[in-house]
Amino acid sequence: MDTKDALALDGLTKRYGDGPPVIDDLSRSFAPGSLTLLVGPNGAGKTTLLRLLAVQAYPTSGTVHYGDLDVHDTPYRYLQEVGLVHAGPELPEHLTAEELLEWILRSREHWTDEEGPSRISALLNRVRLDERRSNLIGTYSSGMVQKAQVAAAFVAEPAVVLMDEPLRSLDTATSEATVDLLRAFVEDGGLAVVASHLTEPLRPLAEDVLRLDDAPTDVTSSPPAQHSSP
């Protein structure tokens, strides 16, 4: 992970059709070395915001910059630095988990014959998917698909991770492993934006908590709750 730039939003607005804006004139930045936790009820705009940051949707108005890059004008360069966990199981069912991670490494020019296989094995073992590494993703349960998504997000050592409900469907051990991966990622200078209804495990990592409420214009930002040491 060489690039350590901020994500900067300027007047970001997204509406669908003639409806009210889901995201309305949002300006803020996300710094490297930090995790921002997105919270709020269903329909408040968390997934829409993550889709905008991941260039899976385009703004009605406003911009998102990663360093000097307008991410919607130059998506390829930006997305080379991004790891994603999607809201839905959007993984190719005709690949195995092992093949998926190898494809990501090769497509981002991070593959080497010496280190690639061991990196994949270690990461799949970390998320407790190593025994199913050679099975097609189309045969996976929802929990196994989620494990594959988490592994895919981290395998190419991204500078940014964008995660929509990363702990959903995970067993306790894999949930803890995912939190540990996020902690190490942020400590190494990574930038993480995470939406989750399961906030308790993530709040200790959060530099900031961004609350999106039912009203499209109701966006507040606050520091996370302080946690005392045991």
Tell me the role of every PLM-derived stretch.
Residues 39-41:
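The feature captures the beta-strand-to-loop junction immediately N-terminal to the Walker
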Residues 161-165:
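Catalytic Walker B motif of ABC-type/P-loop ATPase nucleotide-binding domains
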Residues 95-109:
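Q-loop/switch helix immediately C-terminal to the Walker
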Residues 54:
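Helix-to-loop junction immediately C-terminal to a conserved catalytic motif
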Residues 102, 106, 114-132:
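Conserved ABC ATPase "signature" region
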